[in-house]
Amino acid sequence: MKSWFSKTFPEYKKLPKSGKFMVWLTFVQGLVWVVLAVIQSVQGLINNIAWAVFFGILLFVLGVLALSAAWNAFKFRAVGFKRMTYVYMPCLFQIVFVGEAFSFTYYIESVLQLSFSLTVHKLTFGINFAAILFIVLAGRNYRHLKMVSQNTDKNVEPLEQGQETQS
């Protein structure tokens, strides 16, 4: 008896291990962003803070994009991995400026992060290396799916790096 997941996403088995990891990571990322968007927007409405509502809407859009990318990748579509690159691009940088009169912060968290920040006087600039890794993995899986889809023989898939041929 097949499970609901196997019936809905039969092509999932064709994904390489890095593709499966990226699909689940992006799915969790989308869920986290949608939940945070709802909380942020409700809090902004209660406290009458327009920027909180705007940031909640931005997070909601990013969450829907992440869920769309995961859905398409579960369905073994290359467009899912292409969208994953757009999902993780806003997570690359962290910029914080604290001045006498005002402060500015740009930072969108990803589910997994490994960041390095440099602070000079009142300015902090950070890079999330995990987001760079996720973008690279999404790009590799996108190229892999494009190669598989361009292959004329549907039963033969290109070998992943490190796989051996069976004789």
Residue map of PLM features:
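Topology signature of small-to-medium multi-pass alpha-helical membrane proteins
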Residues: 1-167
